[in-house]
Design a protein with these regions (language model features):
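Sec-dependent N-terminal signal peptides
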Residues: 4-13
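Single-residue recognition of alpha-helix boundary sites
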Residues: 13-14, 203
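Glycan-processing catalytic domains of CAZymes
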Residues: 20-315
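Sec/Tat signal peptide C-region and signal peptidase I cleavage site
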Residues: 15-19
Length: 315
């Protein structure tokens, strides 16, 4: 089946009874995918994108999941077709199937790609929590707060139309996460601390500092740990990938308690004959070089501010 597990966050932890390598494993969950039968719509199963700037020669991408071929397969936006067919992410039976499949794979929880309440991904989050509670499975967030700083929230609440107003609403969203996600039986907890992935690119550091100042933690809760996406691109020199080893922006995020964490490796090489269908790509050596700054400055660091260290794996 087409796995919704697009990335794995391997979180260092010293508690017994977890993964055999002593780490907790969280999988990023991208949604929401619907079906006509269950939801009356298709969601991320369909896709259209203008790709006129691509040097591959392909001018557009178009997947219409309402179209069905002679073998009964829908034209879905997916690299591989699901073994169980096209399903709705909100179907409790399918949620149960995915959670149990994840547990078999020694995955401890899902981080839902989430931007704000009441975005559709918040519905997915809450539906996941209902089923996860039955199976000792954790549901957290990959907080894409850029969604909040686009005009998406303004389309729902017209009065939230300035950065100041969006920052104020972000504080309410953080409080919601504290009250509804970082507590309870499905809370993602590592070493006694709630944890989430902070994708960005929404709030600036000063705005985020204001958000933190307005959030009230319940008695006994430790400050949630934010694993901050560090995805500086790097460059090619003499056909060798050279990663970014530090950045002023990431240093600023560390000042508000965020811990630098890897994301998708940089793809700095441009299309060639062997990679004709890609505008950019990376070699295996590039990927290793991309990860070295995280190894050297985070994993091997004795900095006590790095209370939780997270690695990254992508199938």
């Amino acid at each position: 089946m087409r796995k919704p597990l697009l990335l794995l966050l391997l979180v260092s932890v010293v508690l017994p009874g977890l993964a055999q390598n002593g780490k907790k494993v969280y999988a990023d969950f991208h949604g929401v995918r619907y079906t006509r039968q269950h939801d009356g719509k298709l969601g991320r199963w369909e896709m259209y994108a203008n790709t006129e700037k691509s040097i591959t020669g392909r001018k557009s991408l178009c997947y219409n999941a309402d179209l069905i071929d002679s073998e009964g397969r829908h034209e879905i936006a997916a690299v591989a077709y699901p073994q169980v067919g096209m399903q709705s992410n909100l179907d409790p039976d399918y949620i149960e199937y995915q959670i149990l499949s994840a547990k078999v794979a020694k995955i401890d929880g899902f981080f839902i790609e989430w931007g704000f309440k009441p975005h559709e991904n918040d519905i997915l989050l809450r539906e996941m929590q209902k089923v996860a509670a039955k199976y000792n499975f954790e549901i957290g967030v990959n907080w894409c707060d850029g969604w909040l700083y686009y005009d998406w929230i303004t389309k729902i609440y017209p009065q939230i139309n300035t950065r100041e107003a969006k920052t104020g609403y972000m504080a309410k969203c953080y409080q919601y996460l504290v009250d509804s996600v970082f507590t309870g039986p499905t809370a993602p907890i590592v070493k006694g601390m709630p944890v989430f992935y902070h994708f960005g690119p929404g709030a600036k550091v000063d705005e985020y500092r204001k958000v933190l100042s307005e959030v009230k933690l319940p008695q006994g809760m430790k400050q949630p740990v934010a694993l901050r996406r560090w995805a500086d691109w790097g460059k090619l020199e003499n056909d060798k990938y050279v990663p970014v080893t530090r950045s002023d922006e990431m240093d600023a995020w560390k000042q508000v308690g965020e811990i630098p964490t890897a994301w998708l490796p940089a793809r700095v090489r441009t299309r060639d004959q062997e990679h004709a269908e890609w505008d950019n790509y990376a070699t295996q050596d590039d990927i290793i070089e991309f990860m070295k700054p995280f190894r050297d400055s985070i994993w091997h660091s004795n900095n006590p501010a790095y209370t939780i260290k997270s690695g990254f794996a992508m199938p």
